[in-house]
């Protein structure tokens, strides 16, 4: 199975294009904030927790590629959040990442943001595994599942 989300610091993040599922599994490499915003707006990235992870990773991308100045990071956080203003986790995690970065010296920001995104990613993997283990016990041999909003690791 292809991973839904992968960090590739400091150059990029990789996502599974969810608009093509279930017929095709295509990984997209995202190397800048503009490409991330396009992917979020086009619903290639879906689900509240994954959108939150994308918001944090987007700030890490911005710090690595555009410079980690207060102005650049604040702009990146606003642009990312504006792509899906009703996606609460997106705005929360982008805001948390911005707050973390602004409290640090400029030369420490990119590394700290990638570490924050990695921690969120690890949390997501563990939570998805727990949801899957719990849900597996509820399925019968040939049961059906209807997902709503957060499909976890699909």
Residue ranges and their predicted role:
Residues 44-154:
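N-terminal active-site beta-alpha-beta segment that forms phosphate/nucleotide-binding
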Residues 41:
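Short pre-catalytic strand/loop immediately N-terminal to key active-site residues, enriched for Gly-Thr
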Residues 1-34, 38:
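Positively charged, low-complexity intrinsically disordered leader regions
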């Amino acid at each position: 199975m292809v991973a839904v989300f992968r960090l590739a610091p400091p150059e990029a993040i990789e996502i599974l294009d969810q608009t093509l599922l279930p017929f095709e599994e295509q990984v997209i490499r995202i190397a800048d904030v503009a490409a991330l915003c396009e992917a979020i707006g086009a619903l290639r990235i879906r689900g509240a927790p994954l959108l939150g992870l994308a918001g944090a990773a987007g700030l890490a991308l911005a710090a690595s590629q555009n410079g980690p100045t207060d102005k650049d990071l604040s702009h990146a956080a606003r642009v990312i959040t504006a792509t899906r203003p009703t996606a609460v986790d997106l705005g929360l995690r982008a805001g948390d990442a911005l707050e973390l970065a602004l409290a640090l010296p400029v030369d420490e920001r990119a590394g700290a943001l990638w570490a924050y995104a990695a921690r969120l990613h690890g949390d997501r993997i563990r939570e998805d595994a727990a949801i899957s283990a719990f849900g597996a016990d509820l399925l019968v041999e040939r049961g059906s599942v209807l997902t709503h909003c957060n499909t976890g690791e699909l």
